[in-house]
Amino acid sequence: KKKTYPKVILPGDYPDPSIMRDGKDYYMTHSPFYYAPGFLIWHSQDLMNWEPLCRVMPQYEGSAMAPDLLKYKDTYYIYYPAAGTNWVMWAKDIRGPWSLPVDLKVGGIDPGHVVDREGNRYLYVDKGEVIRLTEDGLATVGEKKKVYDGWKYPDHWDTECMCLESPKLNEHNGYYYLTSAQGGTAGPATSHMVVSARSKSVTGPWENSPYNPIVHTYSATDSWWSKGHGTLIDDVNGNWWIVYHAYANGYHTLGRSTLIEPIEWTEDGWYRTVSAATPVTPEQEIKHGLELSDDFKGPQLGLQWTFWKEYAPKSLTFKEDILWMKAKGRTPADGRVLLTTAEDKNYETQVEIRTGNGNVAGLILYYNEKAYAGVVSDGKRFYIYRNAEHKTELPNRIGKHFFARLHNCGNRLSVEVSKDGEEWTVLASDMDVSSLHHNNYGGFYALRVGLFSAGKGSSGFSRFRYRNAVPREKDMSAYLMVFHKDEDHGLHMAISPDGYTFTALNEGKPVIAGDTIAEQKGIRDPHIFRGPDGAFYLSMTDLHIYAQRDGYRDTEWERDGKEYGWGNNRGLVLMKSWDLIHWKRTNLRFDKLSAAYSEVGCAWAPEVFF
């Protein structure tokens, strides 16, 4: 049965995907940057369900990124850039052991390996450059040569830079296909893209595809921003796919997720994406995803965890289901952090914490040394970070043994603590963490959940939990209805336990006054919808039919009623909330969207659905 695409195969921070097939098995890895141990290898048999296998680079090598994972003859390789040069590791078994990194002593980023028809090996890097490799692939021969200039996209496109990078190569029907990224990895929502070129020779000359860009975000209203860094993969049935990364709209904080789309080959020998395809049937069922919750049974750290800018397994001790982590530094900026990747727009995480004398520990959301938020304690006071530069203090009346809980709901963070994990005290709420991402702090990282230990001695962590916090239907307790009244043109709400008998909220007065949100100082026809992310979406007509009577307008309608008819408004009010209290608003004017809508008669009674 055909399914529609694109689809997310790994939500959260899984950027720069590199994918390969070995018979019926598919393997994939991503950029680890400063997270160590690095290069988490994933395994699948249907391209949709992935299980984590191992981490292959335990030692810390600096910011490693944009790898190329492949198998040549009987050996697996990972080529990657770090510390101003390119490296390679190899293994006979995908699960290891893997070799120590070998310095290729060649600059550039985003390496892409290819073998020509004579068996010669080459390595492409960014800027359209290529260099010959030795037969074993562990050294280079000669100098880099520029062989490709990229694809000239329209000048008016809003991008970050030309940034020709991510060269990945495949051979198909007598051609070599060079798949590259352009436009910049972050920056504007429309920055990134995937482009294609082909050649009869592995070193060019390259002819650009008439279907470029293959993948691109065309508008900031698209569901996925900065789509790019694509790699082609064929499945066991001979179908082809493209895997790439992208930011979820409005969620740079989550990092770049890994997505997949099917492609088709045209009669003239090019490829392009299609919206539907039949997925692969696996030989064995694979449980998808990485379990983030942890009871710290030991004796080794789970695959969900990484250190930041170090690899310090000797700092960890497992004892009686408690992870003891040796402290260092004084604050989250220089302390020891253990991080895991958040996957959801709305999630909750908690952990039981024990601090020692002179020790500070906590639960935080961590981007880098200059961007983090959460709660830490020395047993005497709680320190709540809204960001690295904004810290408040509250008395700790619980002591050195406490529970901490963070709820990140649409980039709005609440912080709670508890003595027993049952009754919670809110220390802070509605803290905005939406700015803690690459476009403000650089680095291409993500806002990850972190365990933090600083000062002296060790901090103890147990019963770590992470869960998607979108409410389940069985946890809901009432029906909500929204409506308007002609006498006040405001938004009213009512609730019901059974869906039949409703009680008005706010003593029957408007919950939101129309003159505070609408251009015409009144709203009508409200519709509310709860999205799959758990947020509430409101849509309303921007219209006050008695605006002249109530002194908001000198005329009966905004325009001549004889020519444009009753009401003749051209606006809607769109709002979003996670808690029905704090709302974001957009005032939509159709005549401002397009000249085609400038003479629209009346826009009213909208309905939102997903």
Place the predicted regions along the sequence by residue.
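Blade-level signature of beta-propeller repeat domains, shared across WD40, Kelch, NHL, RCC1
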Residues: 240-246, 251-266, 270-274
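Loop/turn-rich, solvent-exposed surfaces of beta-rich toroidal or solenoidal domains
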Residues: 164-207, 213-215
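Beta-propeller blade signature
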Residues: 43-44, 88-93, 193-202, 258-266, ...
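Entry beta-strands of beta-propeller and related beta-repeat scaffolds
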Residues: 25-27, 75-78, 119-122, 175-178, ...
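Short, conserved, GDST-rich strand-edge loop motifs in beta-rich repeat architectures
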Residues: 181-189, 246-255, 541-569
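Short glycine/acidic-enriched loop and turn motifs that connect beta-strands
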Residues: 33-36, 85, 129-131, 183-187, ...
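Extracellular glycan-recognition regions
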Residues: 249, 267-476
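Surface loop/turn signatures of beta-propeller and other carbohydrate-active proteins
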Residues: 1-21, 34, 47-71, 97-115, ...
